Amino acid sequence: MKVSLQQRVLFSGLLICAPTHSAELSGFAGLGASVRPIYSGSNHMAVEPLLNAGVNLHSENWGLFGLSTDGLIWGLTPDSPFSVSLLLTQDEARKEVFNYSFSGKKNRDLQGMGDLSAALMAGTDLRYQQEHWMLWLRLLTATEKQRYGGDAPGRSLIVTSGAETELWRWQSVALSVGGDISWANSGYQQRHYGVTAQQAQRTDFAVYSPSSGFQQGGLYAEVVWHLDKNLAAGLTSRAQYLFDEAGSSPLVNSRMQYTLSSLIQYTF
């Protein structure tokens, strides 16, 4: 997920406001690869590079500020089991012609739909965390309306809740499993799964206007191996199912979506 210059400037302003005499600065950087569908609902998979990096500022008076490749986070109560965070992130862009990273191949399944630009999303994250498990709820909404396919649907809104637990740990290796489910409004569904009249004229897809409803449910498993106190390697597998309106879209070739990703991360 890309981070815009606007987000970096905002984070810099927060750093200036934080009392540096009581703050701790840390960071992380990771590199890996993932195998995943080329877009939500596609039955074609692609190998893509993964880059994960960021910095965190932990202040006694202001909480936790984080800037990463996932966006911005302000954790208001980072040291308690129940935490509340404010988020600024992106709903990823989608190209009508997909270029495979490690070959000259192209996928033209969505040609004629037009490129879907990234959307800035703001929201909040609530979670309750104990030593070996956690529950969480996240709400994100687009900061502005966005035209796509000749129409301007309402602002995207998506609510996701989930749970995760650590099943097994041996020395420096841990196995965790989790699940989540998402509900999305019609604006989000139209953005990702809808087909406007203008798009239908340029493609073989029928006009489709999905309504609000459950968007997806997923299960995942993750193995993390701490090589030393600063270096860790992880492997994550995920399976998710597109529900109702999302899964019925003419853009969707497969309701079941699978992802496998690996990452080596260094913290400092």
Language-model features: where?
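Outer-membrane pore/translocation modules
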Residues: 69-164, 168-171, 188-211
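Predominantly the C-terminal beta-signal and adjacent terminal strand-loop region
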Residues: 41, 214, 219-268
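Transmembrane beta-strands of outer-membrane beta-barrel pores
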Residues: 33-39, 57-59, 88-94, 130-132, ...
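Repeated loop/turn-to-beta-strand initiation elements of outer-membrane beta-barrel proteins
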Residues: 27, 60-64, 82, 132-135, ...
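Short glycine/proline- and aromatic-enriched beta-strand/turn motifs that initiate or cap beta-hairpins
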Residues: 23-67, 72, 94
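Residues on the lipid-exposed face of transmembrane beta-strands in outer-membrane beta-barrel proteins
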Residues: 31-35, 51-57, 71-76, 122-130, ...
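Transmembrane beta-strands of outer-membrane beta-barrel proteins
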Residues: 28-34, 65-68, 85-89, 136-140, ...
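Residues that define the transmembrane beta-barrel architecture of outer-membrane proteins
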Residues: 25, 45-51, 116-122, 131, ...
